[in-house]
Amino acid sequence: MPTHIEPDELCRVPVDGYEVVTYSYGSGDNILFLLNGGPGLPCDYLRDPHIFLAEEGYRVVAFDQLGCGKSDRPDEPSLWNIARYVEEVETVRKALGLEKFNLLGQSWGGWLSIEYALTYPDAIQSLVLANTCGDLPHLTTELNRMRDALGSETVAMMLHHESMGTIDHPEYQAAITILNYRHVCRL
């Protein structure tokens, strides 16, 4: 459970007709803009690192991306694409008056950070990637290879549930549990 501490600054930023909630910790001149994992996770699971880095003299800025945490949660599938997320980050940057900053992307936030840095390189002082992947086509190939090892019947079942939008079905979830145990966390 993350440590609870009130942010030094909390803002609501308009994005695409909705609002996202931003959090700032610390007041140093060295800014660390953190993009967390997900998509769909609020940034609070990284609260302890926010606090630690603020205590080390950084101003740490994070936000609940659209669709999660305390930000608005629109039910609009057209919003969920990487280009729009990149523009969301840029909108937040401008709204908070951030010039050059250090960008840290964790997990999904790493993918987003790479795209943001390629689109807005002049805003970036440094880029740190944590627990992420830099080559999505390779990742997709490897994930499919791992899934194929479950056998043709299981793969057919998974593809069926994915096409039907029923990935919450118990047999699909059982297959995901096996994949996660074999390839993500073996505890």
Give the location of each predicted region:
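N-terminal cap/lid segment of alpha/beta-hydrolase-fold proteins
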Residues: 2-19
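Catalytic nucleophile-loop/oxyanion-hole region of alpha/beta-hydrolase
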Residues: 74-86, 133
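Conserved acidic catalytic loop of the alpha/beta-hydrolase fold
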Residues: 83-101
